[in-house]
Amino acid sequence: MHLNSSVPQGTPGEPDAQPFSGPQSEMEATFLALSLSNGSGNTSESDTAGPNSDLDVNTDIYSKVLVTAIYLALFVVGTVGNSVTAFTLARKKSLQSLQSTVHYHLGSLALSDLLILLLAMPVELYNFIWVHHPWAFGDAGCRGYYFLRDACTYATALNVASLSVERYLAICHPFKAKTLMSRSRTKKFISAIWLASALLAIPMLFTMGLQNRSGDGTHPGGLVCTPIVDTATVKVVIQVNTFMSFLFPMLVISILNTVIANKLTVMVHQAAEQGRVCTVGTHNGLEHSTFNMTIEPGRVQALRHGVLVLRAVVIAFVVCWLPYHVRRLMFCYISDEQWTTFLFDFYHYFYMLTNALFYVSSAINPILYNLVSANFRQVFLSTLACLCPGWRHRRKKRPTFSRKPNSMSSNHAFSTSATRETLY
């Protein structure tokens, strides 16, 4: 990406450096759309935006091809993985008892990830990577695109957090979990997540809109999907979005998964040191209840595996989403006077990197969450084999092990199947 030589060398945003007519300076006009996570700016090649386009924002062809190849790979992996996950959870009745109600959370997460890939990635590739403007989908398409993208982003983050809450209750408070995590309550909770996500995304319907920023205001090449409110309002929207779709979910995920990992680690150590017997306890007011449970060697290995998966979940969420939100917050906290040509170029390519990581999150979630349950993984691969006959021949045969029921003693009636639901 480079700026045209015709761009004045003074401070970005000065009145004499206006590529388009309108209230924003050149940097404001460019970064308003960039900072809302979708776009390479409101400016493009001078021959398409009108005679007064002094700012040329170009991505070199090699970067475009590389980003396109990465996006296509993520699109294939993500859509196949999330589609098969959703299909598996909806059609396979053998999963109705999978990890208590965790299959509802997995299904909701797969749906939000799938919608992000289907709704956001194609539009971004076309109108923000290859053809900066004119915007090709009209004013309704502009508002609807940002609304749906933000709603699905909120839903993904909140679904990951809700899955952590479900696992925390199931592992650390198994008695309460049986009461709190009923199927009907879980369905209502997930419905509330989607409703909250839609409500949180409503501001995008009024923040974004179609404007013509060509010199005379009529050139068709100057149509851009851009913020139609003042810069201060845009910054508020960005910061609220960052808090609700990243900081808050990350705090919940990090705390709960740390507690879960520590609990599983203690259980593994107890099982290894005390003859495969671990103790699970719960508090109910003044009453303290405990039960001992014998765990087989295979189950101990599964517990160790569960600890690693939980750590991977936290790391993946932070690695994929932190750069994305850091890049957006750059717009909020870097003043116009601090933007240089070098920083502008860095921002543009940093945009492509962070958005690629953002889509990695949607593509990798099926892999991470399929690792949580061996039962789910088995049914997932079985479904994939049915949908893709060629996959059946590539699957390696794995030895099967017979498992004896877990034995336990407790002052509460607690079934073996219920106990298995609290463990990975």
Swiss-Prot record:
Topology relative to the membrane: Multi-pass membrane protein
Molecular function in Gene Ontology: G protein-coupled neurotensin receptor activity; identical protein binding; protein-containing complex binding
Annotated compartments: Cell membrane; Membrane raft
InterPro entries given in the database record: GPCR_Rhodpsn (IPR000276), GPCR_Rhodpsn_7TM (IPR017452), NT1_rcpt (IPR003985), NT_rcpt (IPR003984)
Post-translational modification note: N-glycosylated. Palmitoylated; this is required for normal localization at membrane rafts and normal GNA11-mediated activation of down-stream signaling cascades. The palmitoylation level increases in response to neurotensin treatment.
Glycan attachment points: 4, 38, 42
Disulfide cysteine pairs (residue numbers): 142-225
Extracellular side: 1-68, 124-143, 207-235, 331-348
Annotated region (Disordered), positions in chain: 1-23, 397-424
Gene3D superfamilies documented for this protein: Rhodopsin 7-helix transmembrane proteins
Keyword Cell membrane: yes
Main location: membrane
Keyword entries, A-Z: Cell membrane, Disulfide bond, G-protein coupled receptor, Glycoprotein, Lipoprotein, Membrane, Palmitate, Receptor, Transducer, Transmembrane, Transmembrane helix
GO cellular component: axon; axon terminus; cell surface; cytoplasmic side of plasma membrane; dendrite; dendritic shaft; dendritic spine; membrane raft
Compositional bias (Polar residues): 403-424
Cytoplasmic side: 90-103, 166-185, 261-308, 370-424
Subunit-structure text: Interacts (palmitoylated form) with GNA11.
Domain remarks in the Swiss-Prot or TrEMBL record: The ligand binding pocket consists mainly of extracellular loops ECL2 and ECL3, as well as transmembrane regions TM6 and TM7.
Function: G-protein coupled receptor for the tridecapeptide neurotensin (NTS). Signaling is effected via G proteins that activate a phosphatidylinositol-calcium second messenger system. Signaling leads to the activation of downstream MAP kinases and protects cells against apoptosis.
Protein name per its UniProtKB record: Neurotensin receptor type 1
Species this protein is from: Rattus norvegicus (Rat)
